[in-house]
Amino acid sequence: MKVRNSLRSLKSRHRDCRVVRRKGRVYVINKTQRKFKARQG
């Protein structure tokens, strides 16, 4: 999982990327290509 300051560029890397909030943190998840996971931090 990558940790990035901004997730704007990461959510456009793949069409299945979704931005979700969990426990006060913002994540990018991808069900089909799991290598695109990221967390904002």
From Swiss-Prot:
- One Pfam family this chain carries? Ribosomal_L36
GO BP terms: namely:
translation
| Record carries keyword Ribonucleoprotein | yes
Tell me which PROSITE patterns the record gives. RIBOSOMAL_L36
Q: Which UniProt keywords apply?
A: Ribonucleoprotein, Ribosomal protein
GO cellular component terms given for this protein: ribonucleoprotein complex; ribosome
Q: Which GO terms describe its molecular function?
A: structural constituent of ribosome
- The highest taxon in the source lineage is Bacteria
Under the heading SUPFAM superfamilies, the entry gives:
Ribosomal protein L36
Q: Which InterPro entries match?
A: Ribosomal_bL36, Ribosomal_bL36_sp, Ribosomal_L36_bact
Can you tell me which family this protein belongs to? Belongs to the bacterial ribosomal protein bL36 family.
Q: What is this protein called?
A: Large ribosomal subunit protein bL36
Q: Which gene encodes it?
A: rpmJ
